[in-house]
Swiss-Prot record:
Recorded superkingdom: Eukaryota
Keywords: Coiled coil, Phosphoprotein
Coiled-coil regions listed in the entry: 93-148
InterPro entries for this protein: Ccdc54 (IPR037758)
Disulfide bond positions: none
Phosphothreonine: residues bearing it: 182
Name the record gives this protein: Coiled-coil domain-containing protein 54
Length: 328
């Protein structure tokens, strides 16, 4: 840009100088021709007359006009010089500005190069992160495929016939262990509490032994039952009720208590272990209660199960967050 402006300034200055110079030359030529025409024989006739005096006056006036013209030329030249100096100063300022702008452009270019390098580095980092994420996804899918069998088994245990089989096994285990524990406790207490009475009749008949032992067994059964109830009320469990909207377990116990809990499928193994480790209660009259495993059908039952599960979930969150199973 500044080169174009300098060319324009030079062209304008040259045009002004040429026009003024041509005018000066033309004016000088005109003055010379006038003088030559007025004094054609001045060199030949040195004598002066009155007419010659008048011509000299005219020549003096013309010389004055020439001096005025020359002064005008000088003033125009001075103006041209001042204009040229102003143009040169403007050109120098323009050149300084262009240099400053070039420096700024160089700084911007360096910054752009740095930003491009940073962008390349970030792009490489992003690609590496994507590769790591893909590798992690593959590992997660592999682990999920490995654990899918166990998870599906835990979720499907409570559906249909498998749920019935598990409940029947629970009933059998609890009933068999209660009977064994009651018999062992009764035998141990009979042997420890009444050794003399049993040994006092070594040669009696079977009929007499049944008559003497039966009231003792009944009394011991009652006392053991009361002690077991007291110890059971003091015992605490480590199993909690967890809301689960997909699966539910219906538990029927030996002594007639019917409880329905919404347990998570992952806690089923822990729940079974807890059941096996609980203290047993000797019943007054052992009875095997068999109940059928029934599934709720119909829209009303579905609504009731959903409402109960939602209430249980809200109660667990805002009430106590964990509710212990204290009665079985």
């Amino acid at each position: 840009m500044y080169k174009l402006q300098a060319k324009r300034v030079k062209a304008a200055a040259g045009q002004m100088w040429n026009s003024n110079f041509s005018k000066i030359r033309q004016s000088l030529k005109n003055a010379y021709h006038k003088c030559k025409n007025q004094y054609p024989n001045s060199t030949r006739c040195p004598t002066m007359t009155s007419h010659d005096c008048d011509q000299e006056d005219l020549n003096a006036d013309e010389e004055m006009n020439l001096l005025v013209m020359l002064q005008d030329i000088k003033t125009t030249q001075l103006e041209l010089l001042s204009q040229m100096t102003g143009m040169i100063c403007a050109l120098s300022k323009i050149q300084e500005k262009t240099d400053f702008f070039q420096k700024q452009m160089q700084v911007l270019e360096t910054k752009m190069n740095v930003n491009e390098n940073k962008q390349c580095a970030t792009a490489e980092d992003i690609f590496s992160v994507k590769e790591d994420v893909d590798a992690l996804k593959k590992k997660v899918t592999e682990l999920g495929n490995q654990n899918s069998c166990s998870n599906v088994h835990c979720l499907e245990v409570l559906d249909g016939e498998k749920g019935k089989e598990i409940l029947e096994l629970l009933h059998k285990v609890t009933q068999s262990e209660t009977l064994k524990n009651t018999l062992t406790s009764i035998d141990s207490e009979i042997s420890s509490a009444e050794p003399e009475k049993v040994l006092s009749y070594p040669k009696s008949t079977d009929h007499l032994e049944e008559k003497t032992i039966s009231p003792q067994i009944k009394a011991l059964e009652k006392s053991n039952y009361q002690n077991a109830l007291r110890s059971f009320q003091k015992a605490k469990s480590n199993i909690y009720i967890y809301p689960d909207f997909n699966t539910w377990i219906k538990l029927t116990f030996v002594h007639g208590g019917k409880w329905r809990f919404f347990l998570s499928a992952t806690k089923l193994e822990e729940f079974i272990q807890w059941l096996l480790s609980r203290p047993t209660l000797p019943p007054e009259e052992p009875q095997v209660i068999t109940q059928k495993y029934c599934l709720f059908t119909g829209p009303i039952t579905n609504l009731t199960t959903i409402c109960v599960s939602v209430f249980n979930y809200i109660y667990c969150l805002f009430g106590s967050s964990k509710e212990e199973v204290t009665r079985l």
